[in-house]
Amino acid sequence: MANIGIIGGHGKVARLATPLLVERGNRVVSFIRKQEQTAEIEGLGAEAVVRDVMELSREELTELFRDAGLDAVVWSAGAGGGDPERTWKVDRDAAIRTMDAAEAAGATRYVMVSYMGASLNHSVPEDDDFYAYAQSKAEADEHLRGSNLEWTLLGPNLLSEEDPSGEIRVTAEPGESTASRANVARVIDAVLADASTIRKAIPFTDGQTPIAEAIGSVPAADRLDHAV
């Protein structure tokens, strides 16, 4: 059993992942921003901690994670687009602080939900609305790769609301394929149970290969913009 903290615990993917992790015998601590979300999160089997992680310092996060006794941290949060300033603040700065805090608190595992193609070589123009997000995620991912954490980078393609198939395709060339949020949740659960995914980047879409088999066959690649 592991003690797993989920950042962005009330997000769609996090709420789908929580009962899967609990069913596997893990203790899940879900970090949420609003008190009124507590009952729903507890109903999924997690412990709810109402703290705005995005506003906490590295030191405050370290104390929070240490008090929770975390072995692993899952980043499943995001600014949600729109305001570039908030995007930098959440998707880069807060994400990096949680990595540093996890390491300082003694957590060893970190799973980042990024996106397919995330890279410092993204080539998105600075005047493009997508630039703040692309650059923020790329810098956060790069920071994680340089840490001492046992990290896994997940790069789902465009998210959809399809029912879970439990099958994916590991690829950095998605075409028009999508990745259902329910399958992303299952991938989070699966990589946390599979040590062979440590220090690997896994870009994926929905596909025809069972998740456990697909992630178990991923070569040792550390980027989400390389074909697999």
Q: What are the language-model segments listed below?
A:
Residues 2-26:
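N-terminal Rossmann NAD(P)H-binding glycine-rich loop of SDR-like oxidoreductase domains
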Residues 3, 71-72, 109:
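Structural motif
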Residues 27-29, 35, 79-146, 152:
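Conserved Rossmann-fold NAD(P)-dependent oxidoreductase catalytic core, especially the SDR/UDP-sugar
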Residues 30-97, 101-104, 192-196:
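NAD(P)H-binding glycine-rich loop region in Rossmannoid oxidoreductase-like domains
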Residues 95, 136, 154, 174-190, ...:
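Substrate-positioning beta->alpha
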Residues 120, 152-172, 204:
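Flexible, glycine-rich beta-alpha linker
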Residues 122, 163-168, 191-200:
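Glycine/proline-rich active-site loop of Rossmann-fold NAD(P)-dependent oxidoreductases
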Residues 180-201, 205-228:
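Alpha-helical substrate-binding/gating segment
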